[in-house]
Amino acid sequence: MNYYLAIDLKSFYASVECVERHLDPLDINLVVADTSRSSKTICLAVTPALKSFGIGGRPRLFMVEEQVAKMNQQRQKLAPNHRFANHSVSLKELTKNIYLKLDYMVVPPRMQLYIDYSARIYQIYLKYVAPEDIHVYSIDEVFMDVTPYLHQYQDNPHILAETIVKDIVQTTGITATVGIGTNLYLAKVAMDILAKKAPADEHGVRIAFLDEERYQQQLWHHQPLTDFWRIGHGISQRLAKLGLYTMADIAKCALAKDDQALNAKRLFKEFGIQAELLIDHAFGIETCTMAAIKNYQAKNHSISSSQVLFRAYEIGETYLIMKEMVDKLSAQLVKEQLVTTHLSLSLRYQAMGKEIQMPKGAKGTIALPCATQSSQQLVRAASQLFSQIIQPNVYIRRVSVQFHEVFPKSQEQAAQQLSLFVNDSLEAYEDGQTEKLAREERLTTALLDVCLRYGDNAVLKASSLLDYSTARMRNDQIGGHKK
């Protein structure tokens, strides 16, 4: 029998911030959020201590403020003369003394720091499991196939899981939640649903196990369905319209005879190929293995960039934002020695009220004359596409740029499928462009070297100094958040 681990670093960003301040992540009330984006900003992480006061994992900052104020109203009623003796961010102190005002820390995100911690923790994983048996699912979550290693741990995956997590705690101060399963799906569900509610040990470690039999016993009637991996609110609502509210309902539907109104055929009619996955998961079955994940190769590759603007931008202002994004992505192509053949744009407009009827946005794709990494060629194509799709008299709140059909520059010649009718013109075009493109590539490479040494804002275009430009700000960000 195979065994898999799903490991989730508990409240990762918040835990890192606590550790950096020599604080206990399980005791301190702390939120990671960028307060410069107003109280509507989404909190990237909340410590377990603060969650214990009824605050969710990814609330908006104003929701934290409201819940804390609500809790303090209740606590104040119990205090002598309805006055707090003091305040505290410590769960232990707040539990011990109900006359203390509930307080919490709000700290800005530091994405590069979290990446560094994640890399350190990955090195801990490698002490126990080979890289070919690890799949990095996100910055704070991994899957492992631990089957080949269990002979060293009394054939007990729980012992191995406990050993790994205790090493992480001792090395970094960060704890984790672990799901153990006989397939990848069961490991993930054991972690997401069972382990997070299981009693913790002295290090805050929670571990849960599922096989197909236990899954059907413990989770077949669990609600809501959105707690299960790969079932979002949209799928859950569509299942509810069919009268399916639990995994047991889906399994029963899959086993129904053809003459019944609700059967497997009805599921496939509603969900297409997705129904196969729903039915498998209803029975706790997952056919995907770690080897299949490692051997998977996407037919098409792409790179993209997207940003939500902090206010409604005019068309001219948005045009600059779009060019900056294309420049940044083209520099990534040069850095990684890649080329692209297609470019797409997506714009989301600012809503103007119910009384004004207008489209939600615009999008389009343009094919390039040839595979390229040239910023000039890509900006020219993007500008042409922008002019084609933009509506007059609109304001824009979101811009997305994507390069499609991305492949190594070394394969560029092999990728060109030339016909008898375009060979001559393309050859003439290439003769006039080769040296120009080579100069541009050398310049871009030199600029990348300067930015690597002195920072991304070491060299900027003059347009990036305009007050509505976002280039400087985004150069100080990773994934849309401060480095």
Locations of regions flagged by a protein language model:
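Gly/Gly-Pro- and Ser/Thr-rich, intrinsically disordered tail segments characteristic of DNA damage-repair
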Residues: M1-F283, M290, L426-K483
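DNA-contacting surface of Y-family translesion DNA polymerases
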Residues: A6, D227, I235-Y395
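Short, glycine-/Ser/Thr-/acidic-enriched flexible segments
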Residues: K10, R37, Q350-M352, V406-P408
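Short aromatic/hydrophobic contact patches that present stacked aromatics
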Residues: F143, A367, S400
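A glycine-rich phosphate-binding loop feature that marks nucleotide/adenosyl-phosphate handling sites
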Residues: T182-Y185, D280-F283, V339-Q350, Y395-F407, ...
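Short conserved micro-motifs at the rims of enzyme active sites and ligand-binding pockets
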Residues: E355-M358, Q411-A415, R472
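C-terminal hydrophobic structural anchor segments
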Residues: Q384, Q388-D449
